[in-house]
Design a protein with these regions (language model features):
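Hydrophobic, low-acid, alpha-helix-prone terminal segments
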Residues: 8-15, 35
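Polybasic, lysine-rich low-complexity intrinsically disordered segments
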Residues: 16, 23, 33, 39-40, ...
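Intrinsic low-complexity, disordered N-terminal segments enriched in polar/charged/small residues
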Residues: 21-24, 28
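Conserved N-terminal catalytic core of the sugar/cofactor nucleotidyltransferase
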Residues: 46, 51, 58-71, 79-86, ...
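Left-handed beta-helix
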Residues: 50, 63-66, 267-416
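Residue-level signal for inorganic ion chemistry
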Residues: 103, 159, 178, 221, ...
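Conserved core of the sugar-phosphate nucleotidyltransferase
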Residues: 184-294, 298-301, 324, 374, ...
């Protein structure tokens, strides 16, 4: 039976076009034909119920054809070392043991509202083959390769100027590749609502999450409006990764949201912000004749060698006077630390988290054990430890010292 959408729409149009059309379908006394019709209607009902359950039908119909998605997949995730490392960062791993890598989950989620030809992936050039293996649906020309790690401002600039060359009327949704989302439909609804807002309002939109703790590893967004019922507000201040004292103050004030690293803007507006606040970067990338041509790889290699390591938060979001925030409510974690990993995972009766049934914990509490699946491990009489092994690196670290993990990754990287 053909259940493709065009066939179903054609069938529905026949049903709703009147009695005469229905009489042409339903033939009195023809039991075999009528059974086929009934079967098709039943299949149709179940098919439409499945679509409506996913909630994607209305979103797809309303999606602006000028909208693009940029998935940022160039980070190393060294706060999650050794499970996330330079050879295989966490976005390419199935860290939560759900059967799919983070980037695969991100693609499957966002591709419900964006066609493949309007999804771009930006990553380090050494990860191109991994992207092609894990996301074979994405055209090769939509994989943007960074020569050097230069943080989010250069990567967003690269994508913005490239997409502008393809479509000067474009809107871009920029998302991380390695975040956990518990409610896909609420997430997609917020993306659509943000796009609709930016189509009417000049400016930059970010999505904020209500904080659950005083976290120093996230950016904080202070909203101008104190009306909690308002979904979108203008941003008063934008602070990237505050110290603990400031984080405590932000958390206690109820005026701040976490920055989820999800941005929505028109290509014209973000390029104007680069001109205003990061003119050096604008000058480097404003050579559109070399983007979307065979000269692009050599051009990007030259440009990235001159780029500074700057985040979009510090380079633009903290400085711009045209920033808005949409309060998201879709269950979010960047899974960037072992603390965040512990919060997401199922625990045993002693608040321990492990990834394997070959790990035995006895008289131990509040531990995290993440080891290769065939590794037999016994943990006896210890509390609050992180025990993690991957690629011949074994780390045993007290959970209160988690902020030192980046040093370990750096030490072994330079030791080589």
């Amino acid at each position: 039976m053909d259940l493709r959408v065009p066939t179903l729409i054609k069938f529905l149009n026949r049903l709703k076009s009147g009695t005469a059309a229905w009489n042409n379908i339903y033939i009195k006394g023809n039991r075999r034909n009528n059974f086929r019709i009934l079967k098709k209607v039943v299949y149709l009902v179940y098919y439409l119920k499945a679509i409506l359950k996913r909630g994607t039908l209305n979103i797809q119909l309303r999606m602006n054809p000028n909208s693009y998605c940029l998935i940022m997949a160039g980070g190393i995730g060294n706060r999650f070392w050794p499970v996330s490392n330079r050879r295989c960062p966490k976005q390419f791993s199935d860290i939560l043991h759900c059967g799919k890598s983070f980037i695969r989950q991100t693609y499957e989620r966002i591709s419900q509202i964006f066609p493949n030809h309007r999804i771009f992936i930006i990553t380090g050039e050494e990860y191109e083959d991994i992207i092609k293996r894990q996301l074979p649906e994405i055209p090769d020309s939509n994989i943007l390769k960074e020569t050097y790690v230069r943080n989010t401002a250069p990567c967003i600039a690269y994508a913005a100027y490239k997409i502008k060359g393809l479509n000067p009327d474009a809107y871009i949704v920029t998302i991380p590749s390695d975040h956990f989302i518990s409610n896909d439909q609420a997430y997609l609804n917020d993306i659509q609502e943000g796009l609709s807002f930016i189509e009417k309002q000049k400016g930059l939109l970010t999505i904020g999450i209500t904080p659950t703790r005083a976290e120093t590893e996230y950016g904080y967004i202070q909203v101008k409006s104190k009306d909690n019922t308002q979904k979108i507000s203008q941003v008063k201040t934008f602070t990237e990764k505050p110290n603990q004292e400031l984080a405590n103050m932000f958390f206690d004030s109820d005026e701040f949201l976490w920055n989820a690293g999800i941005f929505i803007w028109s290509v014209q507006d973000i390029i104007q912000e680069f001109k205003t606040h990061m003119f050096d970067l604008h000058a480097l990338f404003n050579t559109e004749c070399k983007l979307n041509t065979p000269a692009e790889p050599a051009f990007i290699k030259s440009v990235y060698g001159q780029c500074h390591n700057v985040s979009i938060d510090v380079g633009i979001m903290e400085k711009s006077q045209h920033v808005y925030v949409l309060k998201g409510n879709f269950g979010w974690s960047d899974v960037g630390t072992w603390h965040a990993f512990h919060a997401l995972c199922d625990k045993d009766d002693h608040n321990n988290v492990t990834n394997s049934d070959k790990v035995v914990l006895n008289d131990s509490n509040d531990c995290i054990v993440n080891v290769p699946p065939r590794k037999n491990v016994v943990v006896q009489g210890v509390d609050n430890l992180i025990i993690a092994e991957k690629d011949n690196y074994l780390m045993i670290c007290h959970r209160k010292d988690e902020d030192k993990i980046k040093r370990f990754e750096k030490f072994f990287r330079h030791k080589k």
